[in-house]
C-alpha cells in the first residue's frame, strides 16, 4: 500500500482582507514547499475566488463550510456546486466552531459530508472533544460518535481527510502532546479498521489540529499516525511554510 501523503490544511477562519491575504499568498507562492506534502488553504467564502485565482495551482483551496443541497432558499449558505464553480476542490466540514458556536449537529454534518462528496469535493471532516469531555474520560466515546456520523455518509474514502481537533487545544495555546495526539489518532485508525475496512484505515489520512506552530510541528509530524495538520492562526503567518515542511 502506498504511504499516506502528508496533508497540511490552513484554516484562515474569519480573518484577512485582500491586502493581507494577497501578501500571504505571495509568500506561499514564492516558498519552497515539499513536493511530498499536499497543501490546501481554507479561505473565507467571499475570498475563495480571489484565493483560487492568486494561489499557485499546486496549492489547493477549501471552503470553510457548505450546505447539504445544491441550491435553493438558504440565505447566507453556499453549495458544493458553487465551490467547484470557482475552481476550489475542498471543503472543511464539522469544525468545532461550526459545532459549538453555530450549533451544527452530528446529523447535519453527516448530511453535508454526503452531499459534498456526491458533488465531487474533497472533505476535511473534523472531530474532537471538549475539555470537560477529556477530563471526564470520554474522549473516545465522543470522537467515535462524531466519526460514525461522518462514516455513515461516506462511500468512497479516497476524498476524505479526517481532522482530529481537541477543542480545548484550538486557539488556546494548549497543544495536545505528540503522545496524546498519537494515542487518539491510533484509536481512530483502529475504529476505521473495525467499522469500515482495513484498507480504508491504512489509506485515510488523519491529521491533527489544535495550536500547531512552527515550534511544535516537527515532533507532532514524527508520530506514526499523524498524517498532517489543520492549522489555524499559524496558517496566516510565514511560519505556515515551516509547518508544511515539517516532515522534511
UniProtKB/Swiss-Prot annotation:
GO terms for cellular component: cytosol. Its main location: cytoplasm. InterPro entries: Aldolase_TIM, TIM_sf, TrioseP_Isoase_bac/euk, Triosephosphate_isomerase, Triosephosphate_isomerase_AS. One of its GO terms (biological process) is glyceraldehyde-3-phosphate biosynthetic process. Changing residue 95 to N: Reduces activity 5000-fold. SUPFAM superfamilies: Triosephosphate isomerase (TIM). Keywords: Cytoplasm, Gluconeogenesis, Glycolysis, Isomerase, Lyase. Gene3D superfamilies: Aldolase class I (3.20.20.70). NCBIfam families: tim (TIGR00419). Belongs to the triosephosphate isomerase family. This is Triosephosphate isomerase. It comes from Gallus gallus.
